[in-house]
Structures are given as C-alpha cells and as structure tokens.
C-alpha cells in the first residue's frame, strides 16, 4: 500500500495479515489527520477511560494509554512528559496525533513499518510524549491480532483470554 512495506510485520508475536490490517487502520487515520489538518485521538476497541481528558497541548504524538503489556517505568512527574514508560507506545490503544506528527508517521511507515505500538517508538520519532497519570487503560478479554506468544506478556492475559 502506497510504498509501505510489510517485512516488519513478519514476527513471532502477531498474525501477519491481522497485524497489517490493524496498522492500516491507524495509517488511514494519520492520512485523515494530514488531509483535514486536524489533530485526532486514536482509540482502539478496548480503550477504557478512567478519567476525562481536556485540552493538553502537544507537538506530534501524545500517548494517554496505561501500558498494557510487559514491564514499564512509571513517570515521576504528573502531566505531560517525554515518553519514558517504554521506548515505544505502551500499546497503541489511546494516543493523539497532530497533522505534523501524522505526516512523520506516514513518512516513517514508508521506511520501516511494523506493528503499530512498536513502530511508534523513540528510535523513530524524537517527540513522543505521554500523559500521566494515564487516563485510559486497556480492558481486553480477546485479541484478533496476537498469537499466543504475543499474549503472554499482556497484563490482562489469563485462562479466559481468547485468541480469535
């Protein structure tokens, strides 16, 4: 699609076609942000609001999501901070993007696209921020993207979790 390669999606944690489809939905929203010159909030189906969010100024990408898998660092400053909880989005379930940030995401996708959360990382983008305390968390009981190996580090993974 539009010069975006798929090699980065061939990995052990996710099902290839499902992962590409999820990335494509984010990519289309980035395009919409650029085309309409609008800042967008990107939410996945399992995003659950714990607190309201009001106008927080930011430059490119601002994560609102509590880390949903693996180990992470808790920011020690309340409010907007440089992304430190992980070196990549701690799950792509809740973030906002400006038209400038969306343009950077689109350009980088043509260089090295991969699963959305690890694609949006400090190594690729120098201006990712996160808001703490995290006002949104994942409430998931199933996945259509990950393989079992990709689910093992999810905080909500248990014997009732379903891989569809």
List each language-model region with its residue ranges.
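An acidic/histidine-cluster motif and surrounding catalytic segment
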Residues: 1-43, 47-164
């Amino acid at each position: 699609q539009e010069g975006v390669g798929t090699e980065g999606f061939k990995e052990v944690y996710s099902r290839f076609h499902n992962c590409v489809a999820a990335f494509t939905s984010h990519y289309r929203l980035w395009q919409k942000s650029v085309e309409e010159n609008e800042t967008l909030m990107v939410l996945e189906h399992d995003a659950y609001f714990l607190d309201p969010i009001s106008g927080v100024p930011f430059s490119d990408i601002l994560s609102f999501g509590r880390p949903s898998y693996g180990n992470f660092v808790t920011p020690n400053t309340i409010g907007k901070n440089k992304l430190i909880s992980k070196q990549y989005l701690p799950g792509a379930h809740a973030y906002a993007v400006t038209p400038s940030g969306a343009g950077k995401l689109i350009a980088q996708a043509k260089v090295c696209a991969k699963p959305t959360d690890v694609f949006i990382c400090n190594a690729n983008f120098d201006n990712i921020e996160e808001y703490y305390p995290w006002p949104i968390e994942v409430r998931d009981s199933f996945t259509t993207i990950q393989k079992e190996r990709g689910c093992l580090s999810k905080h909500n993974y248990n014997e009732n979790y379903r891989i569809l």
